[in-house]
Every structure is written in C-alpha cells, then in structure tokens.
C-alpha cells in the first residue's frame, strides 16, 4: 500500500500546443479510493497512464510512496491496471488468467494457486475457475480482470473506466462490489470515469478535471454542495444544475420581475459585481404563486422522482429550467408552473471568472 503524488505533472503530446495534463498537483492518501472524473479530453486517462508509466512526464514528477517513479519503467512501479476491455486471454481458463501475472513474476506454483484460490473465493469466482472467458457473462469477465489485478498484491490499483462495457444494472452492482473490495483490501486506488454518478457513489474524494486542469478536489458531498466554479456546478449532479445570469442590486437578484433575496453572506459581493451566475439545483425550485413562469416541455418520470424540463423567459432570453416535481402528480406537457428558488439553496458565481463567490 502506498501514497501516490502528482507534483506539477505535465504532459504535452508531440505536435500539440496544449497540455493534455497541465501542472497537476494531487495527493492520493494511502488506502484511499480517489476518482478522476471529467468529460472526454479532460486529462483523466492521461494522468492515470502517466502514473502507470505508459505516458511520458514532460515536467513535474510522480511519486509512489517515497519513490520518485517519474522515469521508472512500468514493470518496476508495482501497480495493477484494470481496463474498460477485460484483456483476458481467450484460450486460458479463469484460473490461468488470474495466475498469469504471478507466473510472469516467477511466483512459485503453490503460492500462485493459493492466491488464486483465495481471491476467487473473495470475488465469488470459485465455480468458474475452469471456464474460458467466452463462457462467462460481462460482469463475470470484469470480476476475473479484477481478480487478476488483486492476486498481484500491488501497491495501487489503477482503473480506467472498467464498467463502461457493462449494462446499467450490472454497473450498479459492480460499483458496489469494487468499492467494497477496495475497502476490504485497503489498496490505494485511482479510478477514472466520465460518469459523475460513479464518481459520487464510489470515491472517498473526487478530482474534477477539465482541459487538463484540476477544477476541484474534495469529498463527493462537498463537491455537490459547494461546487468551486460554473463548470463543476454544471457537471456534477443529475439532472444538471440550472445556471442563469442575473442582475443584482441591493442584495437581491431579478429574475424576470421576480425578486430573489440573496443570503446575507454573499449579498455585498454580489451587489458589488452587479451581475452573477445564479446556480439552482432542480430540487431547489419550489412551486410559488409569485414565482417565475415556466412552461413544461417534457416530464422525465423515473419512478421515485420526476423532473420537469421547462422553458422560461429569463434574462438573456428563453432558457431551460429543470425542476423536481411530485412524481405522484406530475404536471402535463404545456402546463405553466410558477417556480421560486429556495433562498438557502442558491449558488452564486462570478460571471467573468466562473468562480464561486
């Protein structure tokens, strides 16, 4: 087990003027599961590959424990990777696939067999040890890939979107399985995903990246409750946060004639700016007779919850507003709702910098 550190780590691909990863400073604590999350091109997989030794580090350094591994060959770093593709050998059975890295490391046969037996039992794979990958389901193949990493007993697990090939139901199950396994083993883990639901449900902390730069690093709850900037606010949360520019005067916003009093802690700074980006989670909009008029375009009913996707005449023109509604009595398409933000659920951002006030 080991602490992992990126210290100003930068990667610029040949022929590009932009850094794929730009001066990343990040410490992953021993035994922690940290999730790197962001859209395509954010630098999350580049960071993982640099940690594994599969990408060059153009400047800065990378550490595993007390060892600077910046220029160390991948095979000497003692990390195990799990990929989106299971990368199993089709002609080997499950036991041989799991034992393969131990065989390459010249681990004695008796020890190989004992490690495979122990890990197979842990991952509920014992009855499949004699089967070939083609005889397994997607979830079982992913567990075999996990088992092959676990038997190595590495300093860290590096997981690159390992659940992307699974259907929705299996992803939910495997999210819980991976999180439980990591807690049980206590192995430092870096997990890469574009799926913010995976990030929120699995990580002890999450690192949100965009265009190669770290936007925010904190617990899932803290990132959701206090997004550092407009990008994080719009990326983390499903459905996404509503973001609306509004003018401010005397400590209040004006939304199409509806006056919204700002929290006292933010009112002076917002008034000084004169204009802010107002962030509203869908569950922070409540029905009110004096609220903003919003026409229902679509209702997304997911059973326990329902969301109305509405059009509203807001500053800057007609905008989309998403509001959580009563799933037992959802509104009809074309119906007009009156919605008012909950004052203590407002998020305020500087429109020039995008940073949180």
Placement of each model-derived feature along the sequence:
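Conserved ABC transporter NBD signature motif
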Residues: 60-68
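Conserved coupling/switch loops of ABC nucleotide-binding domains, chiefly the family-specific signature
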Residues: 58-61, 111, 211, 346
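The feature captures the beta-strand-to-loop junction immediately N-terminal to the Walker
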Residues: 37-39
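A short, flexible loop at the N-terminus of ABC-type nucleotide-binding domains that lies
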Residues: 2-3, 11-23, 72-76
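ABC ATPase nucleotide-binding domains
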Residues: 74-231
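Non-catalytic connector elements of ABC transporters
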Residues: 239-241, 251-357
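Helix-to-loop junction immediately C-terminal to a conserved catalytic motif
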Residues: 52
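Pre-Walker A (P-loop) beta-loop-beta motif of ABC nucleotide-binding domains
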Residues: 24-35
